[in-house]
């Protein structure tokens, strides 16, 4: 006798693995680099995206509510995490630069803007490698 039940809906294709905070941040930084924001002179938007992405990465990686903190408050909180002091200082300096452009009208040279994006990506790489090294040492 044929079965009258509908096929089970629980047999779904597996969902792709979630992207790591490191990969997600680096992907956003690549998108910013590929955007035409600098060519269009949209420095405020360029720096807004850098700052937002870096804060989001820090929040996900280190469990710190980075979006709700000033750079100096963030530096104090990061000192209590596994992030190195050097990386924390670099993150704070980059976020301060972002705020200077967004809110104080600072207009950096194109080379400086490109370097700031590279600095944000380097912070992600440094903290990613440092965290991986801690796991393998233990």
Where are the regions a protein language model picked out?
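Generic structural signal for well-ordered, non-membrane alpha-helices
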Residues: 23-30, 52, 56, 76, ...
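Non-catalytic alpha-helical coupling and interface elements of nucleotide-dependent molecular machines
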Residues: 34, 55, 59, 125-129
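Short, charged amphipathic alpha-helical segments flanked by flexible coils
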Residues: 42-97
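Alpha-helix initiation and N-capping motif
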Residues: 22-25, 71, 88, 117
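Generic detection of long, well-ordered alpha-helical segments
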Residues: 40, 44-48, 110-117
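Cytosol-/stroma-facing membrane-proximal "stalk/adaptor" domains immediately downstream
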Residues: 80-138
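Hydrophobic, helix-length membrane anchors
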Residues: 1-45, 128-138
């Amino acid at each position: 006798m044929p079965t009258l039940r509908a096929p089970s809906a629980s047999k779904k294709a597996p969902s792709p693995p979630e992207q790591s905070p490191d990969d997600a941040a680096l992907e956003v930084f690549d998108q910013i680099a590929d955007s035409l924001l600098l060519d269009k002179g949209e420095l405020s938007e360029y720096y807004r995206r850098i700052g937002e992405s870096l804060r989001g990465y820090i929040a996900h990686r280190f469990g710190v509510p980075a979006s709700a903190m000033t750079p100096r408050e963030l530096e104090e909180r990061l000192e209590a995490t596994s992030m190195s002091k050097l990386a924390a200082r670099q993150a704070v300096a980059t976020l301060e630069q972002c705020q200077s452009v967004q809110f104080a009208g600072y207009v950096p040279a194109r080379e400086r803007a490109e370097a700031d994006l590279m600095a944000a990506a380097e912070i992600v790489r440094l903290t990613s490698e440092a965290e991986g090294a801690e796991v393998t040492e233990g």
